[in-house]
């Protein structure tokens, strides 16, 4: 392991908020992890933000003054109060076992993954050396990476927490931390999370990617030059990175399968109805009503 790199000191500024956690460790400085780091540095200048990632990402983070300590090995997290696992889902699960060697109570460990059952089950299988509380901030973007991170990414957005029997004090502190970032913490069961997010997030992503692939293959580059805003708006998510979504689909395949089956059934229904259009009005009117109910 390379020695940790320490960021030069920064002047403290009064924020009116005492630190909830004195030492914050973040593993994975993508859009979510980077945004948490930036927000924490703004909110609690006297807290120490420690990050674990690859060398290039850490160098960028140091240039952006997003972190205080950069390292490539989780051993630096031995004394932290809060660990945030912000890597892809299956990598977070592997990291839990590594943390078990270094992190000790009363440390709180959370993650930011888009599925919850697998990581919660993995945490349950470990000895109780730290308190794990699953987490999922619903404040992402189609453009990922540290370069797109910003300190206000979570403002006004839900941040789902799956405590799974965690102690009240740990949950209280993590809830306060999430609230301070501007998010709206909400408690949800891990199974319910995966079922709901299959429809709210995973199905829209797969639909957007499949639609863009079908359209692109059918009309080619010349045809796409004629496209209007409708196609661009509908397929915005098609720019999302496949490496992240491979983990999401693998750890929520059953619930995503249910969601896909329901969409396929609806499309098949519309396909059969094309010559007469009897179902078209019902579907369009129902969809318009639900669209108005969206709070985003």
Stretch-by-stretch model annotation:
Residues 2-73, 78:
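NAD(P)+-binding Rossmann beta1-loop-alpha1 motif at the extreme N-terminus of oxidoreductases
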Residues 74-108:
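Rossmann-like NAD(P)-binding element
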Residues 97-147:
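Rossmann-like NAD(P)(H) cofactor-binding subdomain of soluble oxidoreductases
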Residues 220-290:
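Interdomain hinge/lid region at the active-site interface
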Residues 151-236:
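Internal alpha-helical scaffold of NAD(P)-dependent oxidoreductase catalytic cores
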Residues 86-88, 113, 163:
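Glycine-rich, N-terminal phosphate-binding loop of Rossmann-like dinucleotide-binding domains
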Residues 23, 48, 131, 158, ...:
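Residues at the starts of beta-strands that form the adenosine-phosphate
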């Amino acid at each position: 392991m390379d020695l940790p790199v320490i960021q030069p000191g920064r002047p403290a500024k009064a924020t009116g908020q005492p630190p909830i956690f004195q030492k914050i460790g973040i593993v994975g400085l993508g859009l979510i992890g980077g945004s948490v780091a930036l927000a924490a540095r703004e909110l609690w200048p006297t807290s120490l933000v420690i990050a674990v990632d690859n060398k290039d990402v850490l160098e960028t983070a140091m240039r952006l003054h997003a972190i205080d300590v950069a390292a490539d090995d989780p051993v630096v997290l031995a004394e932290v109060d809060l660990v945030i696992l912000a890597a892809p889902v299956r990598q977070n699960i592997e990291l839990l076992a590594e943390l078990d060697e270094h992190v000790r109570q009363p440390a709180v460990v959370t993650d930011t993954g888009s599925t919850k059952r697998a990581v919660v089950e993995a945490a349950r299988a470990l000895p109780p050396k730290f308190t794990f509380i699953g987490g999922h901030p619903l404040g992402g973007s189609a453009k990922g990476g540290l370069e797109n991170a910003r300190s206000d990414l979570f403002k006004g957005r839900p941040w789902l927490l799956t405590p799974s029997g965690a102690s009240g004090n740990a949950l209280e502190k993590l809830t306060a931390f999430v609230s301070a970032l501007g998010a709206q913490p909400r408690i949800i069961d891990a199974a319910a999370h995966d079922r709901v997010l299959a429809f709210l997030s995973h199905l829209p992503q797969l639909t957007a990617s499949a639609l863009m692939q079908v359209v692109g293959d059918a009309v080619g580059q010349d045809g796409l030059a004629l496209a209007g805003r409708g196609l661009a708006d509908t397929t915005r998510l098609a720019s999302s990175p496949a490496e992240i979504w491979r983990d999401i689909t693998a750890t929520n395949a059953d619930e995503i399968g249910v969601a896909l089956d329901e969409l396929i059934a609806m499309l098949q229904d519309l396909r059969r109805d094309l010559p007469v259009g009897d179902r078209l009005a019902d579907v369009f009117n129902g969809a318009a009503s639900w669209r108005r109910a969206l709070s985003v």
